[in-house]
Structures are given as structure tokens and as C-alpha cells.
């Protein structure tokens, strides 16, 4: 590890293979917590490259719990966090809208790290059992159409690093790579990131991971979601080509809303917001979810255009299908599920 730390101190980039090897060291018991903290801080200060991100993702996926089945059409819409905006759980709420529109959603997430309420905190508050095995997750994806993958359970080697991340209390490469380490073999992905200069590198990593289609967004105000506040910067991966574009919410019929107006709170407060959106209540929360779910449906290929994606998302909510998916997941996640090993 010392050789890698020296390179980072000197501002040098690591190769993909060096980062892969460093990642395996980070996940081992043969490294001091001080070395882990130093590595994460130095890497953040230098700035992460696509090769470094992919190298670490390779190490994490290698050490993750194995999934035996390929779930056709599986998608994730996990964001990085780390934007400091304290918004409600936009991507988790949107996940049920996607499922209601017929997408199989493998929602990868965690408890709060730099926010008040993480996806795991919200889902527990709503009554979802987040402690599912890979076999149970496969079952839920096939039979319910949505499942939650609790990151610490999927990545047991990360437990010590999670403690160090919490103590550091600053965004690190692990915020960036969280959405990229989903152990399910995803076909498509919608990723929100808090660092605009990482749009292309993250898209390049998704390409290396073999995603058929993907969309990476950095929202107005550097939100790790699409925002109604103003212009959103987007990179689209389709047909193995990467294209940059911008998304103005007003073009799709939404009024501009400041990010401060979609702040969330604790898990109880955020659960109330999510239930309100899924129940069809008109609000700025609903409009934010419609924009994000619409973009995700476009990224998935379920919709040919963003406009069509927003229309499908609206129908998912107003037909009651999105809320039905939540209720079905709550019930099914507590049943004794068939385990596919």
C-alpha cells in the first residue's frame, strides 16, 4: 500500500490494475485503518480517473456475494449521494414508479452516510425487510419486479471501510462507486452523481461493465438526481456510444423549483413524502420523481423518448401500480422466500 500512497501524494494516477490491487488490499484485514483513511482522502484530493474507478469496482464486485442468475432486463437507479442537499429519497421513491411501469429494479443502497435518511432507512420505515439473501433477491426480482440489495450485506468485506467512511464524514470514491458495485448483472442503469466532472468517467465505467444502455446525470445545483431547479447535465450510453446532453425541466412541462423545496428529513418524514407521491398527491416531490423516473425509463429503453418516459411514470403512479409494487414488496420480503442458490 505504501507505494500507492506515495504515488497519490505526488499527484500521480494509478493504473486500473494498480487500483484493483489496492482495492483488494483495502478490503483485506492486512491494512491499518489510518492507511485506508489516508488512501481515500489522497485519492479524493487528486481526483479519480475512470481507470481508478473501474479498478476498484472490479475488486469490490469480485468480493461481493455471488448471484447465480441473470435477471433479464434488470436495472438499478441508485445515486451516489454526497451532494449535501438533504433531499428526500428521490431515487428510492422513483424505483417503485419504475417497477410499476414494468421494469425489474435491483435497487442497491445503504443507510445514511452523508444525509439524514438513506434508502435502507426509508425502506425499513415503510416496512420492507432489507435483510434478504441473494437467492431471495432473485426471487423478488422475478416475482415482484423489485428488490432491495442492502450494500453492507452484499459486500461484507466493506464493513470496516464503512466505519472509516462514517468517521471521515466527507464524500470519497465510495460515494462515486456505490451505484457501480451492484452485484446483479444489470442490463441498464440510471446513475445520479454529485460531481459534474465525473459524468464522462462514470459513463465510461458503465460501458466497461457491459451496460446495454445507461444515463448518468448531475442535476442543477450539483444534485445527484435530476433537478427541477434548472439545467441538468446528462451523459447517455446507447449502442456503445457516449453522448452528452442537457435537460431543461421546463421543456417537459415542469415548473422550476429550487432544490431547497425538496428537502427531506428523518426516515418518518421521508416515508410520508414517499407514500404521498406513490398515492398520487400533487406536489413538487411528485414532479421531481416524474422527471427522474421518466429519465430512467428512457435509459432503460422502456421509453423511446424522455417525454414518453415521463408519461409512463405518470401512469405508473396514477394507476396505483407504483404503490402496489411497494405493498407487494413489503409483504413478499417478510415471507419465507424460495432460495435460489
Swiss-Prot record:
Entry note: cofactor: Binds 2 magnesium ions per monomer.
Source domain of life is Bacteria
- Per its UniProt record, what InterPro entries does this chain match? Anthranilate_Pribosyl_Tfrase (IPR005940), Glycosyl_Trfase_fam3 (IPR000312), Glycosyl_Trfase_fam3_N_dom (IPR017459), Glycosyl_Trfase_fam3_N_dom_sf (IPR036320), Nuc_phospho_transferase (IPR035902)
- What enzyme category does the UniProt record give? transferase
| The entry's keywords | Amino-acid biosynthesis, Aromatic amino acid biosynthesis, Glycosyltransferase, Magnesium, Metal-binding, Transferase, Tryptophan biosynthesis
Name the residues that bind Mg(2+) 1. 91, 225
Q: Which GO terms describe its molecular function?
A: anthranilate phosphoribosyltransferase activity; magnesium ion binding
Sorted alphabetically, the Gene Ontology cellular component annotations on this record are: cytosol
Matches recorded under Gene3D superfamilies: Nucleoside phosphorylase/phosphoribosyltransferase catalytic domain, Transferase, Pyrimidine Nucleoside Phosphorylase, Chain C
Required cofactor names? Mg(2+)
Detail which positions bind anthranilate 2.
165
Kindly list the biological process annotations in GO that this record carries: L-tryptophan biosynthetic process
- The protein depicted here goes by the name Anthranilate phosphoribosyltransferase
Amino acid at each position: 500500500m505504501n507505494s500507492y500512497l506515495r504515488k497519490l501524494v505526488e499527484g500521480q494516477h494509478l493504473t486500473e490494475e494498480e487500483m484493483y490491487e489496492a482495492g483488494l488490499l483495502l478490503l483485506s484485514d492486512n491494512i491499518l485503518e489510518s492507511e485506508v483513511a489516508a488512501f481515500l482522502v489522497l485519492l479524493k484530493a487528486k481526483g479519480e480517473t475512470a481507470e481508478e474507478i473501474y479498478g476498484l469496482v472490479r475488486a469490490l464486485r469480485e468480493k461481493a456475494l455471488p448471484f447465480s442468475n441473470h435477471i433479464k432486463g434488470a436495472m438499478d437507479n441508485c445515486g451516489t449521494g454526497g451532494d449535501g442537499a438533504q433531499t428526500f429519497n428521490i431515487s428510492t421513491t422513483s424505483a417503485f414508479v419504475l417497477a410499476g411501469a414494468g421494469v425489474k429494479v435491483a435497487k442497491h443502497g445503504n443507510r445514511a452516510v452523508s444525509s439524514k435518511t438513506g434508502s435502507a432507512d426509508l425502506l425499513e420505515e415503510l416496512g420492507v425487510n432489507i435483510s434478504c439473501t441473494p437467492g431471495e433477491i432473485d426471487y423478488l426480482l422475478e416475482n415482484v419486479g423489485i428488490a432491495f440489495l442492502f450494500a453492507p450485506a452484499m459486500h461484507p468485506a466493506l464493513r470496516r471501510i464503512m466505519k472509516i467512511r462514517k468517521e471521515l464524514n466527507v464524500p470519497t470514491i465510495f460515494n462515486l462507486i456505490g451505484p457501480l458495485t451492484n452485484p446483479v448483472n444489470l442490463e441498464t442503469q440510471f446513475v445520479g452523481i454529485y460531481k459534474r466532472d465525473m459524468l464522462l468517467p462514470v459513463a465510461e465505467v458503465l460501458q466497461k461493465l457491459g451496460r446495454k444502455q445507461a444515463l448518468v446525470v448531475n442535476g442543477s445545483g450539483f444534485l445527484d438526481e435530476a433537478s427541477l431547479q434548472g439545467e441538468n447535465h446528462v451523459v447517455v450510453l446507447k449502442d456503445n456510444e457516449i453522448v452528452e446532453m442537457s435537460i431543461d425541466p421546463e421543456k417537459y412541462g415542469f415548473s422550476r423549483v429550487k432544490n431547497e423545496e425538496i428537502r427531506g428529513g428523518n426516515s418518518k418524514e421521508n416515508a410520508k413524502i414517499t407514500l404521498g407521491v406513490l398515492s398520487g398527491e400533487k406536489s413538487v416531490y411528485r414532479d421531481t420523481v416524474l422527471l427522474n423516473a421518466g429519465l430512467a425509463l428512457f435509459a432503460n429503453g422502456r421509453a423511446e423518448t424522455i417525454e414518453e418516459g415521463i408519461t409512463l411514470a405518470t401512469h405508473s403512479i396514477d394507476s396505483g401500480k407504483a404503490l402496489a409494487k411497494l405493498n407487494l414488496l413489503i409483504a413478499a420480503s417478510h415471507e419465507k422466500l424460495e432460495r435460489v442458490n
